[in-house]
Amino acid sequence: MQLTVWTYEGPPHVGAMRVATGMEKLHYVLHAPQGDTYADLLFTMIERRNKRPPVTYTTFAARDLGKDTAELFMSAARNAYARFKPQAMIVGASCTGSLIQDDPGGLAKSLGFSIPVIPIDLPAYQRKENWGASETFYQLVRAIAGPKAPAPGTKRPERAAGQRAKCNLLGPTALGFRHRDDITEITRLLGQLGIDVNVVAPMGATPADLTRLGEADFNVVLYPEVASQAASWLQRIFHQPFTKTIPIGVSATREFVREVAGLAGVDPEPVLAAASTRLPWYSHSVDSTYLTNKRVFIFGDATHAIASARIASEELGFKVVGLGTYSREFGRDVREAAAKYGVEALITDDYLEVEAKVAELHPELVLGTQMERHIAKRLGVPCAVISAPVHVQDFPARYAPQMGFEGANVIFDTWVHPLMMGLEEHLLAMFKDDFEFKDGALPSHLGTGHAPASAPAAAEVAVALPQSAPVLDGAASNPAPVATAPTGAVWAPEAEKELLKIPFFVRGKARRNTERFANENGVATITVETLYDAKAHFAR
C-alpha cells in the first residue's frame, strides 16, 4: 500500500459517478460506508453543480457489519426507485463496500424493478477512475442500446438521398476538463459541415436517448479514455465507424474536419476556408518569436497530453523536453508520441516522480493538471492547466473550449500568457544593473529605506557577511555581497556579475553546474575563469 497526499485518479466508482452525474434520469445506488460520500464534493464544490449527484449510498457503519448489510442495500435501492423514479438504475459497490461481497447486481435484480438495472462490477483495487467511467459507459450502452441492435449479418441501410448525416458525440462526462464547452464547439463545427448531432452521451443524455445511438451514421469520439470501448462495440454491432482524430489544435481540427467529412460524404473545403482561428498568425508574428524553442514539459491524461505536445511542437515552436501521463491504459500511445520528440515518456501516477522530472529537466513552461500547477509554483516555473484533474478555477463561467478552432484560440492565450513576453525580457536585461530597477531595489516612490528581506536577490543568493559587519542605513550603502555555494565554494563578486549575464531561464542550472565543478575540483573561490571552465567541462 502506498500512502499519498494526492492522486491523479480516484477509485473506479468515482468514474461511474462521473457518468451517472453527467446523464439525466439515471440513478446510481452505491454500496458504500459513510466515509465514501465525500465524492459528492467533487461535483458540488469543484465543478460547481447546482444539484447533488444522482447517487444513493447505503452508508453502512461499523455497527452494521454484524447485521444483514444485504438488506441495507436492498432498502436503499427500493427507496431510490420510489423517490427518484429513474428511467434506469446502475448498482455497484465502492472500494470499501466491495470487501463485503454482497453482490449488489444480484440483489437489485431480485427486487423486480420495471426499469433496466445494470450491475457495474468494478475491480476497485486494480483499476482507477477513467477505467471505471469507460466500463460504466460501455455497460450502459450495451444494456440499453443492445436490444435495438440489428440481426447478425444485416447490412446497414444506405442513407436516403438528400438526408443530412447524423452522428453521436461520445465521451463527455461530469467533472471533465472543459467538456461542456467542447460539446458546444464541436456541435457548431459539425453543423457548419451539414451534419446533425443525434445523441451526446454520457453528458446530457437520458437512458431513453441511449436507445437511439444506433440511428446515427457514425460516432465522434471526443475522449477515448471514456468512449473508445463503447465506440468499438457500436462499430461491431451497429456497423458505425468512429473518428480517430481528436480536434485539439488547429492542425488536428483540420484533420478532424476532413475525417468527419469523409464519413458523412460532404465537402470539407468551404468550412476549412472559412475557419476563424488566430493561433497560426499570432504564433508566426514577429512579437511571438520569443516562443521559439521554449522548453515545455507536458503531463496529463493521454488525450490532452498527446494533443498538447503536437500543438507545442508544430504550432507554437516550443521544444518538448518531457511528455507523460497517469493513464496507464494509454501508455503505448504516449510512448509513441514521445518518441516523435526524442524524449522518454513518463508513465506514472506518483506526483513525486513528476516533480522530480520537472526539476531535472528545467522547463520554461509546464503544461499539466492541478498538481503540476502546484509543482510549477514551487519550482518557480510558469504553468498552464491542460487536463483533469483540475480545481474550481478550471470550470470557468465563460465559454472556454479546448477543441475546435475557437479552442485553439483559447489554448494560445492560456499557454502564452504565463510566459514572460519578449519585450519584458528585453527590458529586464537592459536595466538589470540600473540602480533603481536592479534586483532588491525598493520602488522609487518609497524613498531610500532598507530593501525588503524577501527581495528576489536575497532569495536567490545566499549572502555571507562578517559577523562584525555594521548594519548600515540605505540600500545604496550595503556592501557588495559574496555568494556562498552549498558545497562550500565562495562566489567572487566578478563571477557573480558574470553569472547575471546568463539568461535567467538557464541561470540556475549554470550556477549548480559551476558549484558542482568547483566542488569536484577542490576550487575554494569561484572566479570568472571557473565559471567558463565549468561551462566547457559540461559542454563536452
Curated annotation (Swiss-Prot):
Pfam families given in the database record: Oxidored_nitro (PF00148), PCP_red (PF08369)
Cofactor or coenzyme needed: [4Fe-4S] cluster
GO BP field: light-independent bacteriochlorophyll biosynthetic process; photosynthesis, dark reaction
Active site: D287
Molecular function, one GO term: metal ion binding
Protein EC: 1.3.7.7
Keywords: 4Fe-4S, ATP-binding, Bacteriochlorophyll biosynthesis, Chlorophyll biosynthesis, Iron, Iron-sulfur, Metal-binding, Nucleotide-binding, Oxidoreductase, Photosynthesis
UniProt organism field: Rhodopseudomonas palustris (strain TIE-1)
Residues the entry annotates as binding substrate: G422, L423
Family: Belongs to the ChlB/BchB/BchZ family.
Protein known as: Light-independent protochlorophyllide reductase subunit B
InterPro entries: ChlB/BchB/BchZ, LI-POR_suB-like_C, Nase/OxRdtase_comp1, P-CP_red_C, Protochl_reductB, Protochlorophyllide_Rdtase
Taxonomic lineage: Bacteria, Pseudomonadati, Pseudomonadota, Alphaproteobacteria, Hyphomicrobiales
